[in-house]
Amino acid sequence: MPVLHNRISNDELKARMLAESEPRTTISFYKYFTIVSPQQTRDALYQMFTALGIFGRVYLAHEGINAQISVPQSKVETFRQQLYAFDPALDGLRLNIALEDDGKSFWVLRMKVRDRIVADGIDDPSFDASNVGAYLKAAEVNAMLDDPDAIFIDMRNHYEYEVGHFENALEIPADTFREQLPKAVEMLREHADKKIVMYCTGGIRCEKASAWMKHNGFNKVWHIEGGIIEYARRAREQGLPVRFIGKNFVFDERMGERISDEVIAHCHQCGALCDSHTNCKNAGCHLLFIQCPLCASKFNGCCSEQCCEELALPEDEQRRRRAGREKGNKIFNKSRGRLNSKLGIPDPTE
């Protein structure tokens, strides 16, 4: 029986990946379709991906698959063919190719079975996730942006919206997708007669959100095909104006793809124009925040003087201090409340 999980340390795997001479391509894809046995599907895909030297993050559930991966360039076409042949539901699936990319986005393959490929909190048995809004292609997106009857809804997190979004897009102020869904319905109820255009990074969240809006009585609902990634790619290929402003946050080592030259965010420590996310260098904090080069030098990559001081302690003392602290998901919590609390930022929603 082959080993179907990684047994090598992250540091060693990262060093191996960085030492590779072959270029890589970052690809994301998703598909809502019925998977009868997610665990068996996961194991088969793990072996296939491993044989091709693929790294990345893949989630499977009975409702489908969601993946962000790094593929050796020489194996991209083989990967495409094998994926399309793996299940009829995946044949011809759109693959989103990263815009700004050296392929060094992942260095380990993590493949997990979950209850949902996107945590939505929906437990309404009458909800039909397949009854989605109509797709919009790049030219249609630009036309909708000029339509006074259309409202663009950003279905991403606050830290994604902060560094980039479509012109005049509405942010849904919530910390998770599951919190955004009911809030979007509530916020847009008075605009039920408008054209609702939903978008996210690669399409997976806005597709489900569009179905949820239709389930709640909204009839004029669209979503951007392939999300921001596909929109920007197609707009550039077709010589269209790219109407997304700033940077597209991505969930890998890059933390962002530059879409336009505008920088619309600010360093969370000094307020200078900056849209570069980082994680606090103190392993006991790991806060996701925006930090300019000057503050990165001043605070040694940390979010605060306290974390900077803790990082300077001997490793044993750092581990002792971390013992008993909040662990797991709490340490990696990206909520607006935790960010504001750690950095003393006024909450814009209050």
Swiss-Prot record:
Please name the catalytic residues of this protein: 200 (cysteine persulfide intermediate)
Q: Which GO terms describe its biological process?
A: tRNA modification
One GO term in the molecular function aspect is: oxidoreductase activity, acting on paired donors, with incorporation or reduction of molecular oxygen
Q: Which SUPFAM superfamilies match?
A: Rhodanese/Cell cycle control phosphatase (SSF52821)
- A Pfam family (short name) is Rhodanese
UniProt keyword list? Oxidoreductase, tRNA processing
Which EC class heads this enzyme's classification?
A: oxidoreductase
Tell me which EC number(s) this protein carries.
1.14.-.-
The region called Disordered is annotated at: 318-350
Known PROSITE patterns for this protein? Answer: RHODANESE_3
Q: Which reaction does it catalyse?
A: uridine(34) in tRNA + AH2 + O2 = 5-hydroxyuridine(34) in tRNA + A + H2O
The record's disulfide annotation reads none
> What residues does the Rhodanese domain cover?
146-240
Q: Which SMART domains match?
A: RHOD
- Which HAMAP family does its entry note? TrhO (MF_00469)
Similarity-based family: Belongs to the TrhO family.
Function (record text): Catalyzes oxygen-dependent 5-hydroxyuridine (ho5U) modification at position 34 in tRNAs.
Record-given protein name: tRNA uridine(34) hydroxylase
Task: Provide the organism lineage as a comma list.
Answer: Bacteria, Pseudomonadati, Pseudomonadota, Gammaproteobacteria, Enterobacterales
- Name the encoding gene, please: trhO
